[in-house]
Amino acid sequence: MYRLLERTLDRFTGLVEYQPTYPFAAPTWVYLVGAILIQQLATRWYRYYKSWVNVPVVGGHGIIGSWIAAFRWTARARSLVNEGYQKYGDFAFQVSTPTRWEVFICNDEMVREYRNFTDERFSANALFEAKYTVPGAAEGVHKVPVPIVAKALTWQRTRAATKTDPYFEEFVKELQHAFDAETKFENEDWNDLCCFATGTRIVAHLTAKSLVGYPLSRDTELIDLFAEYGNAVPTSGFFIAMFPQILKPFAAKFCSAPKISARLDRIVMDELRKREANPRSEPQVQDITDWITFWSRTYPGTYTDQDIARSVVSAVFGAIHTTTQVLVHCLTDLAIRPEYIHPLREEVETILNRDDQQWTKEGLESMEKLDSFVKECQRFNPLDAGSLARRATKDFTFSKGLHIPEGTFVFTPNSPVLFDEKHYPDAQQFDGYRFYRLGRVTGRPLEYKFIAANLKYLQFGDGRHICPGRFMAADEIRLLLAHILVNYDIRPKDDGERPPNWTFKKILFPDMKGMVQLKRRSINISQPN
């Protein structure tokens, strides 16, 4: 039997050479496969007991039961998380996956405690194998501290909100350039728009404008790499995570994310050398790269060009991946729900008329219905079944007595909460004005903005680890939708049907090839002066 298998492998892979056999002997590959199976069984047994947490189990108990649950996880992860939330939503539960146990914290008091832990206690870097995929954010390496990147983004947000600063106007022009460059519509009739591919590249342009500025924001090679990197990090991370620690460096060599990261590092370092040769004064700081460079000068000899480049590149994944997902859902949901088009367009045009046809940050923030529509699209199509994803870097015990061993992966439920009738009445129904009404009824509109977070809306995280780039993401999505509403009519491509979402483990993705159709309107008031 093994000889037949050997010949089959030899024919299809060319990796196994024929070896003469002897009584009680077997080819080397048989021993290798056996050793790998034993190693995997031993690893499974070790992980099962090491990361066991004393909370209810969803899907299966024991070694065999947890294996069955792990296979179920690949196809039905979101339903397993929902099952756990429905049964144990007042405390916590755990589910077995093919590589580990995952613990979900549901109790509000524990979530409040958990959301403010530092990276020294709970870290997010293991989720996408950051050591290999996002070196600028990895643990145990010399790097620009992550909070510094967050401060740089805050500086840029302040620029966007300052009326005398040209940054926001430049950002709008970059968006319009990116839209025209990436769509290339050839006629005035209906044109197909691939939401994911085009959306990814437009977001890549805007991310480049924010991080490295003009003219790199229009460099084709850089935009290609930004767009590829946003999708390469999670896929590479998932692949590397399947291997034991000793084999992860080897597995990483076959992944695209480390290679793209290295190429981006070189591009940013080349740009840094150009800027060093022609230094700018501090008032002329134009982008995140400039800001971090000036910050690093307060610590002479501490940070190299590679450290700065890696910190810039580490922001690319978060800036592109989630933003693009939400943007695609917004485009497809708008196309299949024409009842929202006129009211949203009217809101945008009213504010543009008020502001003399100028796009302003203040005007964008006044588009409350548009903001609500975007947030409802995100709620109705939640990217992940879990949120606040972290790995325990040391043993920890919550104030309620729950003990979390080192190495345990911890989450809070996300999609089950967003469809819980206790928190969102008529949760199964799409309501684009849901958050607009909540803001009006409560008199606290800021609490229901797209960028706002609370215990029942954790899609951007919360507490110490809330996403610092969510403001830029919100600007990109709302500006692009507003631009389309004013300049184009929109409709679904295929007989009114929405391109279907699909899932992989806990993650929900839009149809990567899904399309809508756009047709230019006769009135165009979107171009800035």
Swiss-Prot record:
Heme binds at residue 467. Disulfide bonds: none annotated. Belongs to the cytochrome P450 family. Cytochrome P450 monooxygenase; part of the ATM2 gene cluster that mediates the biosynthesis of aflatrem, a tremorgenic mycotoxin with acute neurotoxic effects. Synthesis of geranylgeranyl diphosphate (GGPP) by AtmG (a GGPP synthase) precedes condensation of GGPP with indole 3-glycerol phosphate, followed by epoxidation and cyclization by AtmM (a FAD-dependent monooxygenase) and AtmC (a prenyltransferase) to produce paspaline. AtmB is also essential for paspaline production, but its exact role has not been identified yet. Induction: The onset of expression occurs at 48-hour-old stationary cultures. It comes from Aspergillus flavus. Its EC number is 1.-.-.-. This is Cytochrome P450 monooxygenase atmQ. Pfam families: p450. Its cofactor is heme. The chain crosses the membrane at residues 22-42, 51-71.
